[in-house]
Amino acid sequence: MEKVGQKIRIIDMDGEPNYAGREGVITHIDDMGHLHGTWGGLAVVPEADSYEFIKE
């Protein structure tokens, strides 16, 4: 379960190859469940994108 404050690494973002490998912290989860954070301007869509949690 995703939570604000967790750190993730994007493995694959549908249609956005430049986002692969980016890391960041989840700062907001919207009503649709999309993850917003410090990795850039686009939201991660859990149903379409691949990512992993980074343990600190």
Briefly describe each language-model feature range:
Residues 3-56:
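Basic/aromatic-rich interaction segments and small domains that mediate binding to polyanionic partners
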